[in-house]
Amino acid sequence: MQLTFIETSIFSRDRSKYFDDDEFRRFENCLLENPETGDVITGTGGCRKVRWKRQGTGKSGGIRVIYYHISTNHRLYLL
């Protein structure tokens, strides 16, 4: 499956605080394999929250990413 990843300005600004380039590619690949991963956030119209365990950290060192997947046009918005 092909997806276009679109980052909000806030996500782009803060991404380097949580992901290095390799880790971010692994995260994107995970979403490419299963864009419906994560829990739907009630009342958002379909936004999802996914937990991501960063390499070298325990579960508590992981991060949460909010995203919205539009399957009809193959876009995934990283919020």
Question: Positions of the model-derived regions?
Answer:
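Short alpha-helix boundary/capping elements
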Residues: P35-E36, H74
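Arg/Lys-rich, positively charged N-terminal/basic patches that mediate binding to nucleic acids
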Residues: M1-D22
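Glycine-rich, flexible loop/turn motifs
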Residues: R15, E36-T37, K59
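N-terminal targeting/export leaders
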Residues: T8, R25-N29, G38-I41
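Amphipathic alpha-helical transducer elements in NTP-driven molecular machines
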Residues: D21-F24, S60
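Basic/aromatic recognition patch in beta-strand/loop cores that engages polyanionic ligands
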Residues: I41-L79
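Generic alpha-helical structural context detector
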Residues: N29-L32, Y68
